[in-house]
Amino acid sequence: MSETRDPRTHSESSLEKGTHPPHQDELATNSTTKDASPVITSTPKKQGAKAWLSLAAGFMGMFASFGWVNCVAIFQAEYEMNQLRDYSSSQVGWISSVLFFFMLGVSPVAGRLYDGYGPRLPIMIGCFFHVFGLMMTSLATRYYQFILSQSVCSGIGTSLIITPAMTAPTTYFHDRRALAGGVTIAGSSLGGVVFPFMVNHLLSSIGFAWTMRACAFLILVLMVITYTLISSNVTHIPKEFKLKNYLTPLRECNFLLLCLVSFFMYWGMFIPYVYMVISSIHYGMSVQMGYNLIPILNGISFFGRIVPQFWARKYGICNVFILAMIASMVIILGSWLPSRSNAAIIVFTLLFGFVSGATIGLGPMIALTISPPNEVGYRMGTAFAVAGLGALTSPPIAGELITGNGGDYVYASVFSGVAYAVSTLVMVILRVRLGGWGLTTKV
């Protein structure tokens, strides 16, 4: 790290080695040639009030967007047992998978808006789509209406919120970017605790329609605060849209490997996220207790998104991420697969909540590490879009496996574990490319 290199050589190799060009004049030069490239205006050693307010805003934005998405398992169970009880698990699963797809797949658009206009424009548009979609969901009675409102409209809104909420605060924290990113992402865990409790208790008292409206009003308040407080430490210059900016990073082997890691990780992760509640009810857990699994999962996930950031700072992001992926695979196959009693299911929920939180929190930080600062927005969007393809397909595939196995969840669990195994293998290859075979090398 301390050796001196020619700036051009360093710039050309920076993406492959996971480092950033070190000179501000070099960044400024790149910004004139890259499309919608934000330019770093300063590198403060001490963060002021503006930085901390932006971090708080990012936390609230993730609370209202990804935090809401974290309670999809409740709606999978609710729809299968009530509103859409005439539909199969696979058909109901499309509501969640389409939501995941738009949440992740629209990220290139969100990244483009963020790079060109800053965090507030995509957050304002995303707030409208997210709140409007939930309001329309409160009126939905047919299958296609749930797809259009909760999956498409609200999904687009969450995507437009997540990218700037997660990215903008990190521009202030150059020395602790991973930790700052972990703090903002942890907002989704807290949202994943509050919203399930809120939905669970309101459904029985005020009904489905007003439950959705109450959640939408809370999200609206949080998003107004987020819009007011958030900012970034870069200058955003809108320029002509060029599709190649999103496709060019895929030519880089390291970035392509990271996209494959994301695809298979989300392929495996969203199966327990979607089917955890309904599978626990299937194996004898009460509906009330089954619904409470989601806030338990997300409560533990909060620590999973924060604590590993400190480990990553000491041992390396990639190293800690690989360990979390291996743990996820083992927990899926060794705990969720054989779990039939309430105690075993709760133990799985606690374990998976922590390790899944770690992978969700560390994954975007790896993308930040191997991307130059002036390309973070659309590179992050591209990686999320690829992950969205995995999120789109895994719940319906798992649903077909469940239906084909007489309603049992064994094959779906195996599918999830194998997807994690493939993702881990690809991540090991990426780690070796970045830091070599040394087990003690910090990567």
Curated annotation (Swiss-Prot):
Keywords: Glycoprotein, Membrane, Transmembrane, Transmembrane helix, Transport. Glycans are attached at N30. Residues 1-26 have a biased composition (Basic and acidic residues). Belongs to the major facilitator superfamily. Monocarboxylate porter (TC 2.A.1.13) family. Disruption phenotype: Does not affect the production of oxopyrrolidines A and B. InterPro entries: MFS (IPR011701), MFS_dom (IPR020846), MFS_trans_sf (IPR036259), Proton-linked_MCT (IPR050327). This is MFS-type transporter opdK. Residues 1-43 are annotated as: Disordered. It is found in: Membrane. The chain crosses the membrane at residues 55-75, 91-111, 121-141, 146-166, 179-199, 214-234, 255-275, 284-304, 317-337, 343-363, 382-402, 410-430. GO terms for molecular function: transmembrane transporter activity. It is a multi-pass membrane protein. Residues 27-43 have a biased composition (Polar residues). The gene is opdK. Pfam families: MFS_1. The keyword Nucleotidyltransferase does not apply. One of its GO terms (cellular component) is membrane. MFS-type transporter; part of the gene cluster that mediates the biosynthesis of oxopyrrolidines, polyketide-amino acid hybrid compounds with feature structures of tetramic acid.
